């Protein structure tokens, strides 16, 4: 197996393991997307790495209704060491080893996690033939960082003082993109909607898509994000990318946003999950304004 021989990794397998390090838990299909290898070929490689205890896994169990949870792989400490030595990066550049924040069992939230990671992988692969843009970094809520004495989702922040529950925001994911020609950087947040959240705002304290949009509006106006993400660039605004299950739900989300600030509609872009994961940087994105029928891109097309 030329992709993995002894302790030597091929460049493609290295890319796949780097994605495992970034995103903690990935399916065979997701590692294949990151590496560019065929899933049928990669599946055997991952099994070998798991037998050698470089990888661990969860899932691959039956679910209610007769369906089956996919098998998700993660790096063990020995796998991290193999990756570090294979790609020649110091730990300070690769990032320290972190075990996935997950128990040994499959949970319903995993479907949301996988859909979110699919979108981040679409960002990565979508830039492969766009050399004028560089992905600076990615964030996602399932990656924990230590703040004070507790571990928090790395995307968690507060839209304003005081730092109370009503002001807390936790984007599903985010990324920073740089235009290599201008040197300017853009900040993007991703919201992955699986169709389970109420669309319109209800009682105070209840969760809804419109309520989440309103929280992002406060985040935009308060500019606290500029300090939080200051280490990655100078940002005066951000763009929220809302990816949902169907075109019908997308249009209903736009209708539910009709009473929100019209001046902030351009900072919110919507698409379906299926289209987003396959054509992320193509002209697929609609404004939050239900009256606007135009599809736009997130970057300039030369």
How would you label these PLM feature ranges?
Residues 1-107, 113:
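Nuclease-adjacent, charged terminal/linker segments that flank catalytic cores
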Residues 42, 57, 126-135:
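Short secondary-structure capping/junction motifs at helix and strand boundaries
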């Amino acid at each position: 197996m030329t992709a993995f021989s002894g302790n030597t990794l091929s460049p493609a397998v290295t890319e796949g393991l780097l994605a495992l390090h970034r995103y903690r838990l990935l399916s065979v299909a997701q590692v294949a997307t990151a590496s560019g290898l065929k899933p049928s070929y990669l599946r055997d490689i991952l099994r070998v790495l798991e037998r050698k205890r470089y990888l661990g896994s969860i899932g691959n169990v039956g679910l209610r209704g007769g369906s089956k949870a996919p098998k998700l792989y993660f790096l063990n400490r020995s796998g991290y060491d193999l990756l570090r030595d294979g790609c020649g990066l110091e730990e300070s550049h690769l990032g320290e080893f972190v075990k996935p924040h997950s128990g040994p069992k499959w949970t319903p939230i995993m479907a949301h996690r996988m859909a979110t990671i699919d979108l981040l992988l679409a960002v990565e692969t979508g830039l492969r033939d766009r050399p004028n843009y560089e992905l600076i970094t990615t964030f996602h809520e399932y990656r924990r960082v230590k703040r004070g004495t507790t571990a928090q989702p790395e995307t968690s922040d507060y839209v304003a003082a005081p730092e109370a529950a009503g002001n807390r925001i936790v984007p599903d994911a985010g990324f920073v993109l740089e235009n290599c020609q201008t040197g300017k950087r853009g900040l993007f947040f991703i919201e992955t909607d699986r169709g389970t959240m109420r669309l319109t705002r209800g009682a105070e304290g209840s969760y809804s898509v419109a309520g989440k949009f309103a929280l992002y509006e406060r985040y935009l106006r308060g500019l606290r994000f500029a300090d939080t993400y200051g280490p990655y660039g100078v940002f005066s605004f951000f763009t929220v990318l809302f990816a949902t299950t169907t075109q019908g739900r997308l249009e209903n989300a736009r209708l539910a946003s009709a009473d929100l600030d019209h001046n902030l509609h351009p900072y919110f872009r919507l698409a379906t999950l299926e289209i987003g994961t396959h054509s992320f940087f193509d002209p697929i994105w609609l404004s939050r304004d239900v009256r606007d029928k135009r599809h736009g891109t997130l970057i300039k097309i030369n």
